[in-house]
Amino acid sequence: MFFPLKKKVLSIIDIANQLNISQSTVSFILNGKSKERRISDKTTEKVLKFIEEVGYKPNLLARSFRTGKTNIIGLMVESIANPFFSNVARFIEENAYKNGYKILYCSTENSLAKSKELLQMFKDRHVDGYIITPAEGLKEDIDKLSKTGAPVILFDRCFEGGNNDYVILDNFQSTYNAVEHLVEQGYKEIGFVTINSLQSQMQERLHGYEKAVDHHQLNHYVKEVGFNMEDENVVAHIVDFLSRKKQLDALIFSTIYLGINGLKAIKKLNLRIPEDIAVIAYDENVIFDLHTPSITTIEQPIEAMSVQLINILLDKLAAKNIINHKVTMPGKLIVRESTAKKLKS
């Protein structure tokens, strides 16, 4: 049986020999430095036409060894399927691409073991910088990575007492403001449904709720559910919570998926929004806008946060700025029908 010979992959040396020009000239042209090196348009066009005809593709790993750069940024989030993280990834990718970088992204599903594996994968790929939504327990690995000089920006959450760069939401104040809004609308028995987690953003949201209800001398009603719990089980837990706490007249959900499952639970109990119970949910999503009645949400400034993330990282990659950036951005309460003024009974 005849096996065709594998087509030889051309190198810069081959191109230089074929065109009878120096290897350095070919290298400068391929790296977009024709003008900088005053290489004639004729020679540049000659090289570009040739590589197009032969289908030349540069060895990116070899280039990274020469330049010390891959022009790839590693983006690690909790779940790329989550609308919040997918929107963030979209904006980061757009801004990175405009600046000559590509994004390699992945999901941790909040697993420490998976996070460690993915972090090693990024290192093996020689990414230039990291944007990370860290799982619990990843602090030591992040600190080691930062000590190598690699630019690392944390997103959505950070580590207490850490010295990392980060861009996060003001979770405490955002939740505090949500409680304030409900109180102003006449609601007094306000519950908080959240994830059983030590992550900084979840803790800050819980603390914001607790501080606000304490300020108004109201009762605490907190329901925590597991992060990896199936949707139907989350719904069942919220149904049980509402059934046991019939005095509740308002609920705040600390994540988008808790908000969606909370609406299912409320529907199962045939409760009316907002007549029987008012609702506020993190984060802004078309589902909440289209729901009848429409749902009040706590919106994170996704585009502004994404721009901050990529700008800080690009500055660090260009060695323009070595100071630490700790950016906390305000949330916005999008008031809709689900928190209409409570009718006096």
Q: Which residue stretches match the model-derived regions?
A:
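Short, well-structured alpha-helical segments in soluble
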Residues: A113-H126, N233-Q247
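Hinge/beta->alpha junction and helix N-cap segments in small-molecule ligand-binding domains
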Residues: V77-S86, C106-K114, Y166-N177, V193-H237, ...
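N-terminal helix-turn-helix DNA-binding module of bacterial transcription factors
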Residues: M1-K69
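Flexible loop/hinge segments that line or gate small-molecule binding clefts
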Residues: N110, I132-N177, Y257, D283-I295
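Amphipathic helical "hinge" segments at domain boundaries
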Residues: F2, D41, E45, V54-G129, ...
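Flexible loop/turn connectors
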Residues: H220, V235-S345
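Short beta-strand segments enriched in small/hydrophobic residues
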Residues: Q23-F28, F65-S79, H181, E189-N196
